[in-house]
Every structure is written in C-alpha cells, then in structure tokens.
C-alpha cells in the first residue's frame, strides 16, 4: 500500500511540474503572438492610403478590415498603370450604416 502512495505522489508531482512548464510555454507563445500582432498593427496601411505594393496590408476599420481596391490609371504618356488604395467596400459601408442606425435607435 505504501508503494502505491509513493508512486501516486510521484505521478502527481511529475504532472504538476510538466503542466506548469506547459503553461509557461503557452504564456511565452501568447506574448510573442501579441507582439507580432502589435507589430502588424503598426505596419498596416490606413484608409485612403496606397496599397499597390501590399494588397493584403490594409488596417481594420470600425467593424471590418479595409480592402485594397485597384483602378487603372492612364498617364499623359498613354501608359496604363494600376493604382490601389485601402477603402471600405460598398457592402461593408451598408452594414456599418445599418449598425450605426441601430445603435442610435436602440441605445
């Protein structure tokens, strides 16, 4: 009976030690993830700014992430170039309008 108690105590000690290391690793991973998100947030492209070179780098708006919208521009030389900017798509604008209107009505 004594051997069983010793083995159980040993197992409990090993499990608690390994879980505490796992929690420390998890906290370190979360910290790295938060730091990466903060770095991404600093590097995102604001609304109405050019996103031609980074079409997936637009920032988040109030409810949705801005989308990179592109247009073809013809220069005075007759060359066509693509210019892109971060903006809110029409269906997102409509959703934001409805939510804003709902907040005004219901509080």
Curated annotation (Swiss-Prot):
| Pro-peptide region(s) | 21-41
Superkingdom as given in the UniProt entry: Eukaryota
The regions listed as transmembrane in this protein's record are none
In this UniProt entry, which cysteines form S-S bonds?
Answer: 44-59, 51-68, 58-86, 70-84
Answer whether the UniProt record assigns the keyword Disulfide bond to this protein: yes
Q: Which keywords does this chain's UniProt record carry?
A: Disulfide bond, Knottin, Secreted, Signal, Toxin
**What residue stretch is flagged as signal peptide?**
1-20
Which is a Gene Ontology cellular component entry for this protein? extracellular region
Q: Name one GO molecular function term.
A: toxin activity
Main location per the UniProt record: secreted
Localisation: Secreted
Tissue occurrence: Expressed by the venom gland.
The question of whether Metal-binding is a record keyword is answered with: no
Q: Which InterPro entries match?
A: Spider_toxin_CSTX_knottin, Spider_toxin_CSTX_Knottin_CS
Annotated domain remarks: The presence of a 'disulfide through disulfide knot' structurally defines this protein as a knottin.
Family to which the UniProt record says this protein belongs: Belongs to the neurotoxin 19 (CSTX) family. 04 (U1-Lctx) subfamily.
Official protein name in the record: U1-lycotoxin-Ls1a
Annotated source species: Lycosa singoriensis (Wolf spider)
